């Protein structure tokens, strides 16, 4: 993504940007988003990451392990609930990585909208490869780079502040790339054109995203609430497929994860970490106006 206003230390104390400085936001909207995520410190993100040091900025999938949760009446229940939410979020990241295709230790991956870097760490641990992350938020990039140094993988995992629509990666050099709940901050044709540029022919692009359902007619009131809460612009499923086709990204797999993510939201709504947006997600998933999907596409 794009920029903020202060240098971001990278490995060895260097800036995390290619030019040794943080570029200015390209638009006022990018500046607003950088400010939003620089100031974000929700317990729902930080306390879940504290479970095992993987800090995510996406939601979870899969069945809730009620046996692991145990009795809601005992003193350790909230900690177990937090651990279970985190397990479901990591399961989502694993599912995304499952769809990246063949990746070797000599390859480079790109996480567009990398947050605090949890998925990047998981990708390196699985494939042994280099993982580059881009974000609008200087605070997120600094956090991700600090975590990489603590883990001793900063020679392979790096976050930088830059515009995901205008990255420094050379044409055709990236094996696979993804947007994990970050494509709602950009124009789809613009972001897919950039992925298509830096992906090698035969490379894989994956997105996991919430999208409004064209069969509903228009974005529902719940989708509008989500847009307002996160200062984003949720696209329709149809828009994703059309923009991919226009940019030489041919979908190979489309998975509707809506039934898989609803249990996560229903559990999160019972925790002390609620943010006020849980009802909008739950109701929009239930009424069919909002969907949670994975799309994996090959660069041709």
UniProtKB/Swiss-Prot annotation:
Domain of life: Bacteria
Gene3D superfamilies: Vaccinia Virus protein VP39
Region Disordered, residue ranges: 1-24
Required co-factors: Mg(2+)
Gene Ontology molecular-function annotations: C-methyltransferase activity; magnesium ion binding; S-adenosyl-L-methionine binding; S-adenosylmethionine-dependent methyltransferase activity
Enzyme class: transferase
Keywords annotated in UniProt: Magnesium, Methyltransferase, Plasmid, S-adenosyl-L-methionine, Transferase
Keyword Nucleotide-binding: no
BP-aspect Gene Ontology terms: methylation; terpene metabolic process
Reactions it catalyzes: (2E)-geranyl diphosphate + S-adenosyl-L-methionine = (E)-2-methylgeranyl diphosphate + S-adenosyl-L-homocysteine + H(+)
This enzyme's EC code(s): 2.1.1.255
Record's function text: Catalyzes the SAM-dependent methylation of geranyl diphosphate (GPP) to yield (E)-2-methylgeranyl diphosphate (2-MeGPP).
Matches recorded under NCBIfam families: GPPMT_Stmyces
Similarity comment: family membership: Belongs to the geranyl diphosphate 2-C-methyltransferase family.
Protein name: Geranyl diphosphate 2-C-methyltransferase
Gene that encodes the chain: gdpmt
């Amino acid at each position: 993504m794009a920029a903020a206003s202060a240098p971001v230390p990278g490995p060895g104390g260097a800036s995390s940007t290619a030019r040794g400085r943080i570029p200015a936001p390209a638009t006022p909207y990018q500046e607003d988003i950088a400010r939003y995520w620089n100031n974000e410190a929700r317990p729902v993100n930080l306390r879940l990451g504290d479970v095992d040091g993987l800090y995510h900025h996406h939601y979870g999938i899969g069945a809730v392990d009620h046996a692991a949760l145990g009795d809601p009446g005992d003193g350790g229940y909230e900690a177990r609930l937090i651990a279970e939410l985190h397990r479901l979020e990591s399961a989502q990241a694993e599912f995304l990585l499952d769809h990246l295709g063949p990746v070797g230790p000599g390859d480079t991956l790109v996480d567009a909208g990398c947050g605090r870097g949890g998925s990047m760490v998981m990708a390196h641990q699985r494939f042994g490869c280099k993982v580059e992350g881009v974000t609008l938020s200087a605070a997120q990039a600094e956090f991700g780079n600090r975590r990489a140094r603590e883990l001793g993988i900063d020679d392979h995992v790096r976050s930088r502040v830059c515009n995901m629509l205008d990255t420094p990666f050379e044409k055709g050099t990236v094996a696979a790339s993804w947007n994990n709940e970050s494509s709602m901050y950009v124009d789809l044709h613009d972001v897919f054109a950039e992925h298509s540029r830096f992906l090698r022919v035969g490379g894989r692009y994956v997105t996991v995203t919430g999208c409004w359902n064209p069969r509903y007619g228009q974005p529902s009131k719940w989708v509008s609430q989500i847009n307002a809460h996160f200062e984003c612009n949720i696209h329709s499923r149809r828009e994703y497929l059309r923009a991919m086709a226009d940019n030489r990204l041919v979908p190979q797999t489309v998975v509707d994860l809506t039934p898989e993510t609803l249990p996560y939201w229903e559990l999160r709504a019972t925790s002390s970490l609620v943010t006020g947006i849980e009802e909008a997600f739950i109701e929009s998933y239930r009424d069919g106006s909002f969907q949670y999907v994975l799309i994996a596409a090959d660069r041709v």
